[in-house]
Structure formats: structure tokens, C-alpha cells
Amino acid sequence: FDIIADPNLKPKSIHVSCFDSAPLSVDFEFILKDNIDLFKIGLDALEILCPDNLNLGLKKSQKFLINELSDYNFTVFDGPHPSGNVGVQIHHINPINSGDVVWIIKPEDIITIGSFLKTGEFCPNRTIAVSGPPVNNPMYFKTRVGAKLNSILNHINFNDNCLLYTSDAAD
């Protein structure tokens, strides 16, 4: 994991976890609802790279995504963390053997691919959750990859001076 995909190696499969089961994480269904068309464009491009082996992991409660993505290969998961972990999902869907090449990609990266294919512009946008006990006003922020944390954190009302900032879902 966390290895850049080698474009010269054909993957056995591509996996996308469309939910994060970690506490205080972003709700991907919330993000995908506003970007479902771009997400589908990105999925269609990935299916060209790995026909019949693009696997989406969906959560049982994601009724919108289950309905919208019915034309794609998905597996529904239910249960506590780490059910949203893509490695756990790969283990259940299509286990990795020695020498296998699989790719994993996050939903927002697929939106970025779809947006690029539709507009020709690279827009690496992200929606992040600012949450947890020290946050008086938990909320989502739309930002870009590489944005300075201060541009976001200056808008948050914290109730504690002892804070831990994590990037992604701290997995």
C-alpha cells in the first residue's frame, strides 16, 4: 500500500472503498452525492484499465450509492471499523497472492479523474471533516490538495488548547 502504481504493470484488480469506518471520518456518500456524474466518468475510465475487476466497497446504509452505482461491480459491507479499510475489503473480495499487482484509489481521486476527463483541467479538490471533542462547531470544508491547514483551522472554534491534527483518517 502507498506505492505509486506502475503504469507498465496491468493490475489484477482495482479497489475503491466508498466509505471510511474510522471514527470522525468523512462521509463519502455526502461527498459523492454532489459529484456522482464525475465519479462515474472516472469509474468508466478505470474500467478500461481493468475490465471486470474494478471493485467498489459500499456500506450497507449507503442507499444512494447502492442505487446510483448499480451498473458497477460492488460489494456491500456492514460492521464496525475496520470494515471500511480497503485492505480488509480486498481480503474478502479478491485476496492478493504473492506477485499480484492491485491498485487502490480513493473516491475523491476518482472524482478528480472524472473532472479532468470532462473539463481538461486538473482540480484536486478535497472535502475534509473537522471534528472531535475539541471542536465546538464540527463541519466539512472544501479545499484543495496541498492547502495550508491555517486557511481552514482559523475558521474553527476550538474548546481546548491541546489539539492533535491528523491528515486523512489517521489510518
Where is each model-derived feature located?
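Buried, small/hydrophobic-residue-enriched core segments of structured protein domains
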Residues: 1-167
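N-terminal low-complexity segments that are often proline-rich with Ser/Thr-Pro
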Residues: 170-171
